[in-house]
């Protein structure tokens, strides 16, 4: 939802839940896999989204410069062609870029591996720029 709506604390919970429902698979496979209804999944998504929007570090980075969301890339890293989608790329200054990779749940080693690949790709895609990359975990009361 961060990629779709940015930092939007003003929208009603109902509007955000409707938006979250539109983003879910229509076959309810996601809800079934976690034993929750699609409405419950949408409510949880909105809670995580609001928690992310409330983070002062995320708000400061969003205000630091122009942002691009869901940035697809293809790069050759160590002879291997890698494709991915960066959640958020922020131009924080002249020749300065910050990558934000949003995650839910608990930190896992593969998250850092993914971020490292994205960082390497961005360094190649933006030669001469300083590139910083951060994992940003959503946390909300009662949610993992």
Regions found by a protein language model. Give the residues of each.
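Metal-dependent nuclease catalytic regions and adjoining charged, substrate-binding loops involved
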Residues: 37, 107, 120-144
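Short coil/turn segments at beta-strand junctions that form active-site/ligand-binding loops
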Residues: 65, 94-96, 129
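A non-catalytic, helix-rich entry segment at domain boundaries
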Residues: 1-78, 139, 144
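Short linear functional motifs in flexible/disordered or boundary regions
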Residues: 10, 81, 112, 130-131
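Non-catalytic protein-protein interaction segments used by genome-maintenance enzymes to assemble
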Residues: 77-116, 120, 124-125
């Amino acid at each position: 939802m961060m990629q779709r709506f940015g930092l939007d604390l003003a929208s009603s919970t109902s509007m955000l839940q409707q938006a979250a429902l539109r983003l879910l698979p229509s076959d309810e496979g996601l809800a079934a896999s976690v034993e929750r209804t699609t409405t419950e999944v949408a409510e949880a998504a909105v809670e995580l989204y609001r928690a992310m929007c409330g983070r002062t570090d995320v708000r400061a980075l969003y205000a630091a410069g122009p942002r691009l969301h869901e940035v697809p890339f293809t790069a050759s890293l160590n002879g291997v062609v890698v494709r991915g989608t960066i959640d958020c790329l922020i131009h924080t200054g002249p020749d300065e870029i910050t990558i934000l990779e949003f995650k839910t749940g608990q930190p896992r080693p593969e998250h850092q591996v993914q971020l490292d690949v994205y960082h390497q790709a961005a360094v190649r895609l933006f030669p001469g720029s300083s590139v910083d990359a951060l994992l940003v975990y959503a946390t909300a009361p009662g949610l993992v």
